Amino acid sequence: MSAKFNVKTFQGMILALQDYWAQQGCTIVQPFDMEVGAGTSHPMTALRALGPEPMAFAYVQPSRRPTDGRYGENPNRLQHYYQFQVVIKPSPDNIQELYLGSLKMLGFDPTQHDIRFVEDNWENPTLGAWGLGWEVWLNGMEVTQFTYFQQVGGLECKPVTGEVTYGLERLAMYIQGVDSVYDLVYSDGPLGKTTYGDVFHQNEVEQSTYNFEYADVDFLFECFNKYEQEAKFLLKQEPRMENDKEIWVETALPLPAYERILKAAHSFNLLDARKAISVTERQRYILRIRALTKGVAEAYYASREALGFPGCK
């Protein structure tokens, strides 16, 4: 178990994971500052998985899934939660051993606990991504997803990126032995204990109310369309009209375009929470996002290729 950090707090567990993966050679980057549904959507994973350039990153990512909100009344369902993401390319042969080492560091002796890798291949339709994967079950509870990326944005991942995604709240609930996420000890210092509920319960209540009851449907449809238009403009797929003139970007800008796509995707997720999209419409919207993501993947790969894939040097 980590001696540096109190892993029986949510804060200490995160610090211990960051320290452990930094010691394995990962660069610890910061959370992406936009609404995403999972740590995979962080550009350090979604885009850096493309092309031959090696990488090793780890980070915490706040994730939003509006339809999962329960007004703060469910002990383990949240519309806003945290993942810890590790991505290494090319995936090292011993990545599973490294992961088991992180569990041991958190106090789980593999000889004393039932740790199982259950096959569960992963797919993200909006990212046009899929991979071979496993859920990791710790004493009967899923705590981690392992994925070996095969495609992102419809492009083949060569070499393969290994991804490890920890469900931080679930892992912490197991370590602390609590049945409600809101009872987790977030920190315990000179000023006393702070619980997860102290920090986030009101946000869950209010954001659930907004997501399900008050998010402006007409505004969100308009947002989706505008973000889609802006992404296409930034990818040189269509012009923008300014003062009755067509304006084109000189060179595709995949990183800003990707941010517009994430905004469109979050607008879509809010519309989904408001039940404003039918089943058939839902598929059409997913395909629209997927088409944009494919454009970003191709433009990003081309931009790195034009630079001579500098990370390979």
UniProtKB/Swiss-Prot annotation:
CDD domains: GlyRS_alpha_core. It is found in: Cytoplasm. GO terms for biological process: glycyl-tRNA aminoacylation. Gene3D superfamilies: Bira Bifunctional Protein, Domain 2, Class II aaRS and biotin synthetases, domain 2. Pfam families: tRNA-synt_2e (PF02091). GO terms for molecular function: ATP binding; glycine-tRNA ligase activity. Keywords: Aminoacyl-tRNA synthetase, ATP-binding, Cytoplasm, Ligase, Nucleotide-binding, Protein biosynthesis. It catalyses: tRNA(Gly) + glycine + ATP = glycyl-tRNA(Gly) + AMP + diphosphate. Belongs to the class-II aminoacyl-tRNA synthetase family. PANTHER family: GLYCINE--TRNA LIGASE, CHLOROPLASTIC_MITOCHONDRIAL 2, GLYCYL-TRNA SYNTHETASE. This is Glycine--tRNA ligase alpha subunit. The gene is glyQ.
